[in-house]
UniProtKB/Swiss-Prot annotation:
Complex and partners: Homodimer. Interacts with PIN1 via its WW domain. This interaction is dependent on Stil mitotic phosphorylation. Interacts with CPAP. Interacts with RBM14 and this interaction interferes with the interaction of STIL with CPAP. Forms a complex with CPAP and SASS6. nteracts (via N-terminus) with CEP85; this interaction is essential for efficient centriolar targeting of STIL and subsequent PLK4 activation.
Annotated Polar residues bias: 473-493, 500-512, 540-551, 883-895
Pfam families listed in its UniProt record: STIL_N
GO biological process: apoptotic process; centrosome duplication; determination of left/right symmetry; embryonic axis specification; floor plate development; forebrain development; heart looping; in utero embryonic development
Basic residues bias (residue ranges): 949-959
Organism of provenance: Mus musculus
PIN1-binding: annotated segments: 567-760
Highest rank taxon of the organism: Eukaryota
Keyword Glycoprotein: no
Name of the protein: SCL-interrupting locus protein homolog
Length: 1262
């Protein structure tokens, strides 16, 4: 084995005998300084979610226990600084053997920040960020990491602590955040020198290659350098055991671009203070070598590095602080994409005091000084040598470099040992003065600065002069920080100027009041602020900040200066709001519990709807302003435009684009005076701020948004006014305009606020509807009260208009129709609102009021109207109009809701009123014909003329005489207007009849007879969307059922049939009624997927094919057919009505008459009739003479591709199998065979069943 040395020609390695002139020290470039914060201050990026979680945790735990914020520290891309991202919260946990709380879910590489949240609202003097123990533990942790052999992490060279003091304000929470970090103050300067030869070892060749070890591992690498006798450099890994025995001359790094990277600084600290290095060899001037394998250079770079302090430096520490006040709004989702930015700064007037405090504590630390050369037997006992490689693989000369005492020191951690020494020394050194008092005097940044609550600027000036050292610099720092944070990502020129001003004029500016300091810092602002105005309007100082730099905070919060928050926090007589946005709210507004600064949404590009929804969430708690309130006395258009008070009658907001800080006239009409008191005298002398050229101190984007918002509001209110005027001219309308008193009374009726009552914001209701199904009680109203309903409804049902949205809907749900017999079903279907709106309104879900019941008419465009009994069900068809492609009824649209209808003419009101008046007219006669069991209403889209003819046919059949159409029409209009429904005009029908979107003739079917647990909404959209590609086929629940029971082939078949039918004649498809008793909209449901009981149940009611399809039917086959012919022959109301260029008679009127006659025929046997829910298959004779013009029964509306899901026509289904326990005839007798239907329309009977592409995007409900 010994012969290998001569064969390999290896010679013993020796350091140069002379330690002089080891390399050429001639500089070839400029000097570069190394420090963590030399080029850029450390940045903090804190997510709003983490702060909210810490605040919530502190409120729940009254003990004020410490918690933790977790994040990660990364080096910036340009390597000029570091960024700490704090995005998690950890409540911490207690460990029995540990005195302090530890995080519960800390991961390797996490940056741990101890945090305390003071909920009690302590004063500024009582809030201490660091105490003695905190400082000592932080310094020991820094020393340990620098001296150990652990992996070098820049994040462990920065010990950060947080202090959060929340204070609840009117619309959110003010957070006073104090960040205090301790880091090492040792810095280095390095100068590039000429290259030095390197021994070409495997490590050196790897580092010089294109794919070195740092690039493979994706992280930077560093190690140490020694030298041989020829003065060539030998590179060693950090973990090489020879590091502890060889003289070292410097360090090498790879995977780094620039030498000023914080990672290079950390490696220099490790080289200077590592306890595992026995001997360091410096040049004559005390320099060492840095070899940098840069990612951007092919050859290594050589630098000569010198500690800036001294040749044998000690560990020095530096304090970095930041104090900010931010405001987070209530009821706003935290924005995770835009964190809050902070900067840790060491530039302050208290640098000397901080250095003195830290030096006193650091003197207690033992071995801090690194020796140039230490003999192997004199390695410090507290060496942090935890790597076992030294014991296992290091060379073992005699005497051994690992004595017994050293091994013992490795077993016992050195941190507790240091802790004992440090605590004793610190206690002794602080016996002369109280530690808290010492830190208060010598290092005010350790304690939140005190700011007395003053009532005038004179006292403020005196107090500031009396406390020059403590208060002055801190005010400047907070002013500078607030200004810097308010600028966002803009240039930091002003920041640097203010810093320069603060540093150069430090001492003279100590006695200057902070408002004046802010005036100097805000030299860009042109206004002058009088001192006597400061106590009254502290936010005036902050209100001019946007003129210095526009505020465009995307994270729903605004920083305010430290001064502006103090009066609000503790001083009750003269409170003030911090300038969350430049709102200039007067000091008497402290009681406005519901002032909503809606600008938080405007910065995100949200629309009026979202702002109003935000208001509607938080404002109902305070229905009206406090009596001492004085809101909206500011030129801020954003606040005024969305404030409940500012939206006065006539659309004139309480602001003007050119108000320039003057108080806006808030005192409106007399009906608003009760809600909005006159401003107090203190508020009326608002000083003018800096001239803003009519932009009210806003950024251009914000001002544009406010202008557009104002324009839209004015347009909306003008349209509402026109609608109200048209309604007031209508003789059939009992009540046209709602007053404030009416609005208050109608708050329980889910009525929206009219524009005269806009000062009561608590009435903005949810635009959704709950529809009762699956209970017998919910299928019909109380028949006994039908006669009284038309008389009582006009008294209760006041139509009201809300300017909070540019949308309109109808709500005929009131206390008169909410009878005891119409309680909502437990199986209600909530249909969300999908508006067609270019504003992209995102609504907030709100519960429906208690008065909501099954009789409520939908606010949705796709929810039908339901009728109380069989009389209505047989002959009433609604003339419904919706937004485009919704296929749903729009008789539900009235100027009191929230549908986007700024462009719909006012002549819709007449048709709506005619429609609902006819309904109420039928309701009034309902109790006279109780011999016929209730079935359900057939809801169709058809013309008003058809409605009148159908009603005429019904009156002829039941009363054996014709009723004058004019009488019927007048009664219909009267009743409809009493309920506030407006009926579309025939001219609008003709205008839109070119584009047929949706039509459906939905007959009666028992949902529970199809599939157990299925309500009527499951088939509300069956076969309605094949006419237009913009349609949606099924409701979500039916889609889910189809996905559950249909195979892939069947789904593909349906999609193919749908695509084929889209190219065919849509009018033909309208007239098809599926006669196959096994389908009922589910013709492809496979019996193999059902249980035996389900199959038997469905076969019994003709829902599946069986050997005897009529085994459970009681009617003869030709019964319904003959009745249908009879109705068609004898009922003139079913005759076709020619309309414009249309050639075909309407099928709907005849279908209504036919269904009515069938119902009367069924009455003889007391068996309710179930009819097919689909509208695809057609009866041949109906096709022959009614095939040409089904378009007359459709509403033509503009296609809306934005609609992704619309509810279709739904049935109000009576459940006879539950209520009368009778067998049910599922369909009328003789209907064409499935073969005939297939010949007529190929696969159209199921072609519009569903759209597979959209179906797969909907959630499965089963």
């Amino acid at each position: 084995m010994n012969t290998r040395f001569p064969s390999s020609k290896m010679v013993p390695f020796h350091f140069p005998p002379s330690k002089l002139a080891l390399w050429n020290p001639m500089p070839i470039g400029e000097c570069i300084y190394l420090h963590l914060s030399y080029y850029r201050k450390p940045k903090l990026m804190v997510t709003e979610k983490a702060i909210r979680l810490a605040y919530r945790h502190a409120k729940q735990n009254k003990k004020n226990v410490p918690c933790f914020l977790l994040g990660s520290l990364t080096v910036d891309e340009d390597e000029e600084g570091v960024t700490l991202t704090i995005d998690r919260f950890d409540p911490g946990r207690e460990i029995p053997e540990c005195l302090e709380r530890t995080p519960t879910a800390s991961l390797p590489g996490d940056f741990l920040i101890p945090c305390r949240v003071h909920i009690q609202g302590l004063g500024s003097r009582d809030v201490i960020v660091h105490n003695a123990d905190d400082f000592s533990s932080a310094l020991k942790a820094l020393q340990y990491h620098v001296c150990s052999k652990d992996f070098l992490d820049c994040g462990k060279l920065l010990c950060l602590r947080a202090q959060i003091t929340p204070r609840e304000s009117l619309d959110g929470v003010d957070f006073n955040l104090q960040w205090t970090a301790v880091t090492l103050a040792n810095s280095f300067k390095c100068v590039p020198v000429k290259p030095i030869p390197i021994i070409p070892t495997a490590l050196a060749r790897n580092l010089s290659s294109n794919l070195n070890i740092s690039q493979v591992q994706g992280t930077y690498k560093h190690g140490y350098i020694t030298m041989d006798e020829t003065r060539k450099l030998l590179l060693l890994l950090q973990s090489d055991p020879k590091v502890s025995s060889l003289p070292l001359v410097g360090i090498w790094l790879a995977g780094i671009i620039h030498v000023y990277s914080p990672q290079v600084w950390a490696c220099c600290l490790r080289y200077m203070f590592s306890s595992s290095i026995q001997e360091r060899v410096f040049s004559e001037s005390g320099n060492f070598i840095i070899v940098l394998y840069s990612l951007t250079h092919k050859e290594p770079e050589f630098y000569e590095c010198l500690p800036c302090e001294s040749r044998t430096p000690d560990l020095q520490f530096q304090l970095l602080t930041n104090k900010e006040t931010l405001h987070l709004f209530n009821n706003v989702e935290p924005s995770g994409k835009n964190p809050i930015h902070f900067e840790l700064s060491a530039e302050s007037q208290d640098a000397e005091a901080e250095a003195e405090v830290l030096s006193k504590i650091s003197k207690t630390l033992p071995v801090k000084r690194s020796s140039q050369k230490l003999s192997p037997g004199k390695i410090p006992i507290n060496k942090h040598d935890t790597d076992l490689e030294d014991e296992d693989f290091s060379p073992r000369p005699i005497p051994s470099p690992h004595p017994v005492s050293q091994k013992i020191s490795k077993v016992q951690p050195s941190v507790p040992e240091l802790s004992l020494v440090l605590d004793n020394n610190f206690t002794e050194s602080s016996n002369q003065s109280n530690p808290l008092e010492m830190m208060t005097v010598e290092n005010p940044l350790l304690i939140k600065p005190s700011q007395p609550e003053l009532c005038d600027a004179k006292h403020s000036s005196e107090a500031t002069t009396g406390e020059p050292f403590r208060r002055g610099p801190t005010n400047q720092l907070s002013q500078d920080t607030a200004l810097r944070q308010s600028r966002g990502k803009q240039s930091s020129t002003c920041k640097k100027e203010s810093l320069q001003f603060r540093n150069t004029n430090a001492k003279p500016s100590l006695s200057v009041p902070s408002p004046d300091v802010a005036e100097k810092l805000q030299a860009v602002s042109a206004g002058s602020m009088q001192k006597e105005d400061y106590p009254v309007r502290p936010s005036t100082l902050d209100s001019r900040q946007p003129s210095l730099a526009p505020q465009a905070q995307p994270h729903n919060l605004v920083f305010s200066t430290h001064n502006s928050t103090r009066p609000m926090e503790l001083q009750v007589p003269t409170p003030s709001l911090p300038s969350y946005y430049p709102t200039n709210v007067c000091s008497c507004c402290q009681h406005h519990g519901h002032i909503q600064y809606s600008t938080i949404n405007s910065w995100q590009g949200n629309t009026v709807g979202s702002i109003q929804d935000l208001r509607s969430e938080s404002l109902p708690k305070h229905a009206f302003f406090h009596s001492s309130g004085c809101p909206s006395l500011c030129p801020n258009a954003i606040y005024s435009s969305s404030s409940p008070v500012s939206m006065k009658q006539g659309g004139m907001g309480a602001y003007s684009p050119h108000s320039n800080g003057e108080p806006s006239p808030v005192a409106g009409p007399s009906h608003v005076d009760s809600c909005v008191p006159h401003p107090c005298a203190m508020c009326m002398h608002t000083p003018n701020t800096a001239p803003d050229n009519g932009m009210m101190g806003l950024s251009p984007d914000a001002y544009r948004f406010v202008t557009e918002q104002d324009r839209q509001l004015r347009l909306l209110q003008a349209q509402i006014q026109r609608l109200l005027e048209a309604q007031s001219l209508d003789p059939g309308s009992h009540k046209t305009v709602a007053t404030v008193e009416d609005t208050v009374k109608a708050a329980k009726q889910m009525e929206l606020v009219s524009m005269e009552a806009q000062s009561s914001p608590g009435l903005h209701m949810r635009k959704s509807v709950s529809i009762a199904v699956s209970t017998g009680a919910s299928l019909f109203w109380n028949a006994a009260g039908d006669d009284q309903e038309p008389d009582s409804q006009p008294k209760q049902d006041d139509t009201k208009i809300s300017s909070e949205d540019m949308n309109f809907s109808v709500d005929i749900n009131n206390e008169a129709t909410s009878l005891p017999g119409s309680a909502s079903s437990l199986k209600a279907v909530d249909i969300p609102s999908f508006e067609e709106s270019n504003l992209a309104v995102e609504e907030v879900n709100q519960p429906l009021p208690e008065s909501n019941s099954s009789s409520e008419q939908s606010k949705e465009p796709g929810v039908p109207v339901f009728f109380p009994n069989a009389l209505l069900a047989e002959s009433v068809s609604m003339c419904l109009q919706t937004a485009p492609t919704e296929g749903a009824s729009n008789s539900t649209e009235l100027p009191q809701g929230t549908k986007d209808e700024p462009y719909r003419p006012s002549d819709n009101q007449k048709i709506y009123q005619d429609l609902l008046g006819q309904v109420n007219h039928l309701l009034s006669n309902a109790s006279q014909e109780t011999e016929e069991p209730p079935t359900k209403a057939v809801v169709t889209n058809r013309e008003c003329a058809k409605t009148q003819n159908t009603h005429h046919a019904r009156k002829k059949r039941h009363n054996s005489g014709l009723v004058d159409k004019d009488c019927v029409l007048s009664a219909t209009i009267k009743q409809l207007r009493s309920l506030g429904v407006k009926i579309d005009s025939p001219t609008k029908v003709k205008k839109n009849e070119q584009k047929v979107d949706h039509a459906s003739v939905l007959a009666c079917i028992s949902p529970e007879a199809v599939i157990s647990g299925l309500n009527y909404m499951s088939f509300g959209n069956v076969g309605m969307s094949s006419l237009s590609p913009t349609g949606v086929d099924l409701s979500m629940e039916a889609n889910a059922i189809a996905l559950k029971y249909l195979s892939e082939n069947q789904l593909s078949q349906l999609s193919l049939a749908r695509s084929k039918q889209n190219n065919g004649d849509s009018s033909v498809g309208l007239l098809h009624i599926n006669s196959d008793r096994s389908t009922v909209g589910l013709s492809l449901v496979s019996p193999s997927n059902m249980s035996f009981a389900t199959k038997k149940y469905m076969k019994r009611y003709g829902l599946l094919q069986s050997s005897d399809n009529s085994e459970d039917e009681e009617e003869p086959p030709s019964h319904a057919d003959s009745e249908s012919d009879h109705v068609l022959n004898r009922n003139p109301a079913c005759r076709p009505v020619q309309c414009g260029h249309e050639k075909e008679p309407s099928w709907n009127a005849c279908e209504i008459a036919q269904c009515s006659d069938c119902g009367s025929a069924d009455t003889r046997t007391d068996v309710p009739v179930l009819r097919n829910i689909t509208n695809q298959a057609v009866q041949p004779r109906a096709t022959e003479h009614l095939n040409e013009d089904s378009a007359i029964s459709l509403r033509n509306l503009k296609p809306n591709p934005a609609m992704n899901l619309r509810t279709g026509k739904a049935e109000f289904t009576h459940h006879p199998e539950k209520e009368n326990e009778r067998d049910i005839a599922v369909f009328p007798g003789t209907l064409p065979s499935p073969e005939t239907l297939k010949q007529m329309n190929s696969m159209d009977s199921v072609g519009t069943f569903l759209d597979v592409k959209r179906l797969r995007q909907l959630p499965k409900l089963f």
